[in-house]
Regions:
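Loop/turn-to-beta-strand initiation segments
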Residues: 79, 149-152, 183-191
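Phosphate-binding/switch loop-helix module in NTP-utilizing enzymes
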Residues: 112-182
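C-terminal regions of RecA-like/P-loop NTPase motor modules
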Residues: 2-26, 236-270
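Glycine-rich P-loop/Walker A and Walker A-like loops and their local beta1-loop-alpha1 context
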Residues: 30-87
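Nucleotide-state-sensitive switch-loop elements of NTP-binding domains
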Residues: 86-130
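Short beta-alpha junction loops
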Residues: 86-89, 185-187, 191-197
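Phosphate-binding/switch region of NTP-binding enzymes
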Residues: 192-260
Length: 270
């Protein structure tokens, strides 16, 4: 068998017969988050067009993950949206990548926080979700259709919406929004602070996502630290190990260890 035949045999595919012809279905390609440990656990990144929930208490590690996700998109010239109530995490990106980075600030004091610009949308708050949907639709229509598969968005307002609108209304809004984002070619990370909500509220929201990533606090040899784990990722391969996020040196060692794991360290849900 030739090398070309070997390579073709190894390609993951779903085949069916249509008018005597075999069709090959492409698997979901990964979109790198830019956060090395997370990309390693995900075996490359988040599958394109997936919606993933990031549950985390307020911490530097969560902020860094969000920042890397946004920076990676902007630096790669990929359409990148950031929906937030406090824009300091990515203010420089809005200024430096005005053609591909779009900021949506849901804050009544937004105009005092950030100068107006064509790529910055300032809304009164999270109370009127219709206004946010209109702003997202307006910005999406400005994007290059050829970049549909590499678009990314971070929704950093879920906990605010959930506390303001309640589980029923938030779930209804998210069902519509996530469907629209997927059809528009966006890969989504939605940030939720689990400490602010009841288990019932969390379940009502988390069940809408195809994947779930969790950052928790726990003890390390050096004291309290943060740990990252992929809780689920629908029908995708990922490492089930929990990674420690405390200290750059420890992160480097953890990343090296994860990359050296053999196949028993992987989990596939089918």
């Amino acid at each position: 068998m030739s090398p070309e035949e070997d390579a073709d045999k190894l390609k993951p595919r779903i085949s069916f017969i249509q008018i005597g012809r075999e069709e090959q279905m492409k698997p979901h390609l990964p979109l790198a988050t830019g956060y090395t440990i997370l990309d390693t656990l995900l075996c490359g990144g988040i599958p394109q067009k997936f919606a993933v929930a990031l549950t985390s208490p307020p911490c530097d590690e969560k902020d860094l993950l969000i920042k890397r996700f946004l920076e990676t998109g902007a630096e790669n010239n990929e359409p990148t949206f950031y929906v937030n109530v406090e824009p300091s995490l990515a203010g420089s990106l809005a200024a430096n990548y005005s053609s591909t980075f779009y900021m949506f600030i849901c804050n009544p004091q937004g105009e005092a926080i950030m100068k107006s610009a064509p790529n910055i949308y300032i809304l009164k708050g999270v109370e009127n979700l219709t206004d946010l949907n209109i702003a997202l639709t307006s910005a999406t229509r400005k994007l290059d259709p050829s970049q549909k598969g590499t678009r990314r968005i971070c929704l950093n307002i879920i906990s605010d919406v959930l506390m303001q609108a309640g589980a029923v209304q938030t779930r209804k809004w998210l069902i519509e929004l996530l469907t629209q984002l997927k059809s528009s070619g966006f890969t989504t990370i939605a940030v939720i602070d689990p400490q602010l909500h009841s288990p019932e509220q969390l379940h009502a929201i988390l069940s809408l996502f195809e994947g779930e990533v969790d950052i928790r606090e726990g003890e390390t040899e050096e004291g309290m630290g943060r740990f990252l784990k992929i809780k689920r990722m629908s029908n995708q391969k990922y490492l089930k190990d929990e990674a420690c996020l405390t200290g750059e040196e420890q992160q480097d060692q953890q990343t090296s260890h994860l990359r050296d794991l053999d196949s028993r360290g992987f989990m596939r849900i089918s």
